[in-house]
């Protein structure tokens, strides 16, 4: 590949012991994800979120550089998030950490995968208990 080592960076995060009300609040999650994208320096293109009954939210923020997604399970205090950024200008960990803080996640586990390089190699794995 020409000037980049990868086509992109993909952070997959497991967030546990999150605030129930925040995990179930679609407007809050939508704004949190837009703010996370902007904080990381991304350009927001489109936003789509859905509130499930009786609880839970799924959504995506499309950015010029790729996307941020969430699937929340308030009854378990759990959220599954992905932050994928193309190129090397934006650090997806900035957005992922902002989201974890915003959901008051007490336990976090994440991996970062380089995309577009062929075989997968896990570059980062961390668990934080607060």
From Swiss-Prot:
Matching InterPro entries: AdoMetDC_C (IPR042286), AdoMetDC_fam_prok (IPR003826), AdoMetDC_N (IPR042284), S-AdoMet_deCO2ase_core (IPR016067), S-AdoMet_deCOase_pro-enz (IPR017716)
Catalytic activity reported: S-adenosyl-L-methionine + H(+) = S-adenosyl 3-(methylsulfanyl)propylamine + CO2
Catalytic site positions: 66 (schiff-base intermediate with substrate), 71 (proton acceptor), 86 (proton donor)
EC category name: lyase
The protein's Enzyme Commission number: 4.1.1.50
List of residues that carry Pyruvic acid (Ser): 66
Pathway the protein acts in: Amine and polyamine biosynthesis; S-adenosylmethioninamine biosynthesis; S-adenosylmethioninamine from S-adenosyl-L-methionine: step 1/1
Protein name: S-adenosylmethionine decarboxylase proenzyme 1
Cited Pfam families: AdoMet_dc
Gene Ontology MF terms in the entry: adenosylmethionine decarboxylase activity
Keyword S-adenosyl-L-methionine listed: yes
Cofactor names: pyruvate
Disulfide bonds: none
Any one GO BP annotation for this protein: spermidine biosynthetic process
Function of the molecule: Catalyzes the decarboxylation of S-adenosylmethionine to S-adenosylmethioninamine (dcAdoMet), the propylamine donor required for the synthesis of the polyamines spermine and spermidine from the diamine putrescine.
Alphabetized NCBIfam families for the sequence: SAM_DCase_Bsu
Family statement drawn from the similarity comment of this UniProt entry: Belongs to the prokaryotic AdoMetDC family. Type 1 subfamily.
The record's account of how the chain is modified after translation: Is synthesized initially as an inactive proenzyme. Formation of the active enzyme involves a self-maturation process in which the active site pyruvoyl group is generated from an internal serine residue via an autocatalytic post-translational modification. Two non-identical subunits are generated from the proenzyme in this reaction, and the pyruvate is formed at the N-terminus of the alpha chain, which is derived from the carboxyl end of the proenzyme.
Cofactor note: Binds 1 pyruvoyl group covalently per subunit.
Gene field: speH1
Keyword Transmembrane applies: no
Subunit structure of this chain's protein: Heterotetramer of two alpha and two beta chains arranged as a dimer of alpha/beta heterodimers.
Site label Cleavage (non-hydrolytic), positions: 65-66
GO cellular component: cytosol
Organism: Bacillus cereus (strain ATCC 14579 / DSM 31 / CCUG 7414 / JCM 2152 / NBRC 15305 / NCIMB 9373 / NCTC 2599 / NRRL B-3711)
Gene3D superfamilies: 3.30.160.750, S-adenosylmethionine decarboxylase domain
């Amino acid at each position: 590949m020409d000037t980049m080592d990868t086509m992109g960076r993909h952070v997959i995060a497991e967030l546990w012991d999150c605030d129930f009300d925040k995990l179930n609040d679609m407007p809050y999650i939508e704004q949190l994800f837009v703010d996370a994208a902007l904080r990381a320096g991304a350009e927001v293109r489109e936003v789509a979120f859905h509130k499930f009954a009786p609880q839970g939210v799924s959504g995506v923020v499309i950015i010029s550089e790729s996307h941020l997604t969430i699937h929340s399970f308030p009854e378990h205090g759990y959220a599954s998030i992905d932050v994928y950024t193309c190129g090397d200008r934006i650090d997806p960990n900035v957005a992922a950490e902002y989201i974890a803080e915003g959901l008051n996640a007490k336990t976090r586990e994440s991996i970062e995968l380089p995309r577009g390089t062929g075989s997968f190699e896990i570059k980062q794995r961390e668990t934080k208990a607060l």
